[in-house]
Amino acid sequence: MRPIPAGGKFRCEATLERELRARGFRAVAGVDEVGRGALFGAVFAGAVILSEERPIRGLNDSKQLDPERREVLAGRIRERAVAWSIAAVDASTIDSINIYQASRMAMRIAVSRLSPAPDFLLVDAVPLEFAVPQRALIKGDERCHAIAAASILAKVARDECMRVWDKVFPEYGLASHKGYSTPEHYRAIEQYGPTPLHRLSFEPVRAHSRFPLDHDRQLDLFDTAGAA
């Protein structure tokens, strides 16, 4: 199904989920990705089936929430949701297949990990290749509770990952800018060159790359960060 055209400001609510449940769907999943525009690290995706009996107040696009509020809501989502999952696709894969396809891959993986399996998908912006009815919503994380919940989980998980990587690569300020395009990040790339976990197909990273991406080195670095 094609994305629904955007129409100005939206109010984030559970109207769509209620309408779908009224039509007989019982496992409506929201799906969203985070980190698509970053220069460093994986793109993350979340998938969430919210509980009708245990609603969560205050859900909204993760970008509109401060970090403390996101953490609180992420805890409530993990506690109250019928099912939730998070997936990540690393920088080497992003460089191999492009960020659009990598984002879709992360979302597909997140959906495939849900138990129970969803019977309807509400996806932010892009439809996915699933034999399940779905609806793609422009600015879905601003207008749909389930998509907002997926966005929050993915954002919190990715931010935590950036804090871990900041200990491995302290020169780059990852805990601050989370791998996105900032003057601080640009200066670090210019001074030190990109790490193996930067997206080498992205500008300005490509212009300062001093080595080909070494996938085995990436895996070693993931092990190092996991032990940090």
UniProtKB/Swiss-Prot annotation:
It catalyses: Endonucleolytic cleavage to 5'-phosphomonoester. Belongs to the RNase HII family. Its cofactor is Mn(2+); Mg(2+). Manganese or magnesium. Binds 1 divalent metal ion per monomer in the absence of substrate. May bind a second metal ion after substrate binding. GO terms for cellular component: cytoplasm; ribonuclease H2 complex. Residues 26-214 form the RNase H type-2 domain. Its main location: cytoplasm. Gene3D superfamilies: Ribonuclease H-like superfamily/Ribonuclease H (3.30.420.10). Endonuclease that specifically degrades the RNA of RNA-DNA hybrids. Pfam families: RNase_HII (PF01351). The gene is rnhB. Transmembrane segments: none annotated. It is found in: Cytoplasm. GO terms for molecular function: manganese ion binding; RNA binding; RNA-DNA hybrid ribonuclease activity. Its EC number is 3.1.26.4. It comes from Solibacter usitatus (strain Ellin6076). This is Ribonuclease HII. GO terms for biological process: DNA replication, removal of RNA primer; mismatch repair. A divalent metal cation binds at D32, E33, D124. NCBIfam families: PRK00015.1-1 (NF000594), PRK00015.1-3 (NF000595). Keywords: Cytoplasm, Endonuclease, Hydrolase, Manganese, Metal-binding, Nuclease.
